[in-house]
Amino acid sequence: MSRVIRAPRGTTLHCKNWQIEAPYRTLMNNLDPEVAEDPANLIVYGGAGKAARNWEAFDKIIESLENLEEDETLLIQSGKPVGIFKTHTMAPRVLISNAMLVPAWANWENFWDLEAKGLTMYGQMTAGSWIYIGTQGIIEGTFETFAALAKKHFDGTLKGKFVLTAGLGGMSGAQPLAVTMLDGACLVVEVDRNRIQRRLDTKYLDVMTDNLDEALEMVLKAKEEGKPLSVGLVGNAADVHPELVRRGIIPDVVTDQTSAHDPLNGYVPNGMTLEEAFALRKSNPEEYIKRAKKAMAEHVSAMLEMQKRGAIAFDYGNNIRRMAYDEGVKEAFNIQGYVPEYIRDLFSEGKGPFRWIALSGDPEDIYKTDEKVLELFPEDKLLERWIRLAREKIKFQGLPARICWLGYGQRAEFGLAINEMVRKGELKAPIVIGRDHHDTGSVASPYRETEAMKDGSDAIADWPILNALLNTASGATWVSVHHGGGVGIGYSIHAGVVVCADGTKESDLRIERVLTSDPGSGVMRHADAGYEIAIRTAKEKGIKMPMLK
């Protein structure tokens, strides 16, 4: 019988203080059955993104945190605790490095070989950095992306528009809800019936069907009537998308969030059942990868044909274009990436995904912080709309949590306000504040966050390392550096940061420094690349950049 892990609730400490209790609880929360995609195998989301290397390592991490002193730092090497060193009370309590490889060795084949030897672990982004909050963790970013698309192409709404996509995993499962929040009609293709059911259970999806004709009838009727609706179709996009092209049914928007970044443990080939695919994955991995890449080529070819016939097509950061390109689809990069198309301006002003978790386990703590963020930033109408929709439509998974996009200055102001609420006893327990690695200054990913940079610096990976070093120096509660998140091994380097608001004056210092430095490094990165919004933000906010003219 598999183990069931859930984070403790309430105010009883299992560690020496809340700065240690915070990672203790959020690591467990990552493996909560409500949160993780495959908790029995320590897989949190994103194909094979894990929280710990194996169960022995997990147990040792928990034991280490329970015994960690207030002035010690625990080191995690790809999901395994390898050392505890005396540092100081304002240093991070945990430092994490996941899946890092010397560049010439940085490909899936070498990674899988080293993983099989028990030497490394794929941490995705927030899986191995212990700050995943379920599908809500990506929902506002997805909402922001589709809102920006709607603003650019459709007068600010998806009403009366048909959006086609694929994938209903831990991250991709946010797509249907984001589309219906913007009043659109969405068809999502997913090979795994259980994943579709999970999105139904959490109310991210409206309807499930096995029948393409039925799915199209529902979606096209909703489009015609201008009603929001999301339909999950059990099927393979490499079969469904070409069939839509053959029928001449072209969506208004087409994208994709399957786990194409991982051709072995993520994307599922067409022409076989899910059970047959899983069996082939184990018996003949090389053949599986070959078939998966062939299916990706068919999938992307159909998206390109839809684009030629008038659909707005964009890549949603899973590296499917590169996989298809390597299989001979030379026009794959005619599909534009979502960051340069819709998100870059937000990143340039230091805006990105800001999340917080109620360690008490009480939803009321989140509702009170919802009110606080609205009180602090009444001029931000998109934020107001988002919080209202989130409270209405999003079901908490594991420990109650919230995400919203906040910019430079806003993050520190809100973080300090949360710490004050904890100090005054307005909240039942401390709050953990973190973010996705998919943020303004914390990623080098040429096929996603840093695609088509103005100065050609797409592949420069100094920036996420500087971000991690700066957050460590600023006194974050824990800091992580990962390789391969989102787009796969060899294609990205990225960093994460978390700070615990425990109500102390020391936390005021941590929060102000971290939540200023972290987004500030993103403004710096984009200003250095020549983005006018970032240059203006740096000057207006007084961010010191010695070479900024």
Swiss-Prot record:
Its EC number is 4.2.1.49. Its cofactor is NAD(+). NAD(+) binds at residues 46-47, 124, 190, 195, 236-237, 257-261, 267-268, 316, 486. InterPro entries: Urocanase, Urocanase-like, Urocanase_C, Urocanase_central_sf, Urocanase_CS, Urocanase_N, Urocanase_Rossmann-like, Urocanase_sf. It comes from Thermoanaerobacter pseudethanolicus (strain ATCC 33223 / 39E). It is an enzyme of class 4 (lyase). Binds 1 NAD(+) per subunit. Pathway: Amino-acid degradation; L-histidine degradation into L-glutamate; N-formimidoyl-L-glutamate from L-histidine: step 2/3. The keyword Transferase does not apply. GO terms for cellular component: cytoplasm. Belongs to the urocanase family. This is Urocanate hydratase. The active site is at residue 404. PROSITE patterns: UROCANASE. Catalyzes the conversion of urocanate to 4-imidazolone-5-propionate. It is found in: Cytoplasm.
